[in-house]
Amino acid sequence: MASVAVENNVVNHIAEEIIRPVADFSPSLWGDRFLSFSIDNQVETKYAQEIEPLKEQTRSMLLASGRKLSETLNLIDVIERLGIAYHFEKEIDEILDRIYNENSNFEGDVYNEDLCTCRLQFRLLRQHGYNISLKIFSKFLDGNGRLKESLASDVLGLLSLYEASHVRSHGEDILEDALAFSTTHLESATPHLEYPLKEQVRHALEQSLHKGIPRIEIQFFISSVYDKQAIKNDVLLRFAKLDYNMLQMLHKQELAEVSRWWKDLNFVNTLPYARDRVVECYFWALGVYYEPQYSQARVMLVKTIAMISIVDDTYDAYGTVDELAIYTDVIQRWDIKEIDSLPDYMKISYKALLDLYKDYEKEMSRDGRSHVVYYAKERLKELVKSYNIEAKWFIEGHMPPASEYLRNAFVTTTYYYLATTSYLGMKYAKEQQFEWLSKNPKILEGCVTICRVIDDIATYEVEKNRGQLSTGIECYMRDYSVSTKEAMAKFQEMGESGWKDINEGMLRPTPIPMEFLSRILNLARLVDVTYKHNEDGYTHPEKVIKPHIIAMVVDSFKI
């Protein structure tokens, strides 16, 4: 829950004084900065004309024969890190499929690559869903099954090993050792490295590639690594910069559209108790998908996040127990005729919520998919029920058992709801995908767990200082008679287990296409970035998210 300060408010013209836990949220950092933007058609046309031949040259590079395995893997890795792989998904999948099938167990003399290539191959294949064998590590182990100390001097190999260790699944102890081994030796080596490798290693230790938000990692790699390297492919670099700027224009246009929608709703004035974070909501949606084909999905998701943030703050930072009970019931009924039973301030968000979903149904009807909006509505109804339980615990000072807390708090992460909503605007999302998601598959549970425990760790001190009893850490400490440090260690362990669930859930054969699984992975990545160093980057964006937003939707590459 948000940090709150109790103050008196008179609402609905009722004479009696109502004590409300009103949150003291900071105003938006952005004002009307993103309210107006229109794409320069001449610039767009110029970029598109230059990109086309660069794209064909890149495709020719991918399809060229006679390359060494290491050269092929490095080319794919660079293309992915530069953010242009979405142009070549079919080609990359075919290449990796061939590499995997040629020697899936990595046994015998056919396999004799260096540390860097081995780890890169392992990571790329795992990230594309191939359950590559751990035998690929065998030649780098000593007689005790530990990584050879002689590897400690190979910085590029260590960096590749470090990145590969983050795609580990349950029971892969060798990768646990690899993470510790590579981290220790990279930290020791960093002060002695030359730029840009030094910056690349420093960044990786701060934010692993696998757990990073793709668009942020792309911007960093182009500007701080590849552009600074002595040896680079100028075609790929030029292509990447043009493509980044081209996409950024689309992103700015979307953000302007959403900002105008938000300003027209006027929640800043009519519901001043709530957070004004529409730009941060767009950052969140951009983290889930940045590619151009997901423009509709992005706009729908950012509106959903912004709206649920208002609902969250209504439960978290303003409503009374009685009001929230009515609000919860009315949302279950989902009928505009019920609006008169609500206090005046709740009518505003309730009507906006119903209007938003009416717009979704109209938009989805063009593709004959309006019926799948039902799944998002059901998740929303589930969410507000849990919000209501959480609010009642807080207001009444109740501390539930840890198991009961977690069961409810998994829902209030909003991630069951947001994962479902993220599929709405995806053109190929059919009822099958929504049905699968509605059953809370293990990969989704892993994502939700990560969000819950990392949030609880990050906000523990703030919530403790305001006397909140029903926090996950406090509940766990009481139930298991452990210290704060031990409880946090357990929650951290749960988060790591959640990542392993996600990594396993991405492996083939998958129940639904990778396109949909990637949304769940990206939601988990958003948590890793937004709560970095135990900061609540959404509520207090100036410390964590602001630099990323500027990099993603303000700063462009010089062409």
Curated annotation (Swiss-Prot):
| Listed EC numbers | 4.2.3.61
Q: In which tissues is it expressed?
A: Expressed only in treated leaves an not detected in control leaves.
Cofactor dependence is on: Mg(2+)
Write down the chemical reaction(s) this protein catalyses.
(2E,6E)-farnesyl diphosphate = (+)-5-epi-aristolochene + diphosphate
GO cellular component terms given for this protein: cytoplasm
**What does the entry give for GO biological process?**
defense response; diterpenoid biosynthetic process
- Which pathway does the protein contribute to? Secondary metabolite biosynthesis; terpenoid biosynthesis
Q: Where in the cell is it found?
A: Cytoplasm
Q: Which residues bind Mg(2+) 2?
A: D312, D316
Q: What induces it?
A: Up-regulated by UV treatment.
- Residues spanned by motif DDXXD motif: 312-316
Q: Which residues form a coiled coil?
A: none
Q: Name one Pfam family in it.
A: Terpene_synth_C
Cofactor binding note of this UniProt entry: Binds 3 Mg(2+) ions per subunit.
* Keyword terms, alphabetized: Cytoplasm, Lyase, Magnesium, Metal-binding, Plant defense
| Main location (coarse class) | cytoplasm
Domain free text: The Asp-Asp-Xaa-Xaa-Asp/Glu (DDXXD/E) motif is important for the catalytic activity, presumably through binding to Mg(2+).
How this chain assembles, per its entry, is: Monomer.
Family from the record: Belongs to the terpene synthase family.
Name listed for the protein in its UniProt record: 5-epiaristolochene synthase
The species is: Capsicum annuum (Capsicum pepper)
The top of its lineage is: Eukaryota, Viridiplantae, Streptophyta, Embryophyta, Tracheophyta
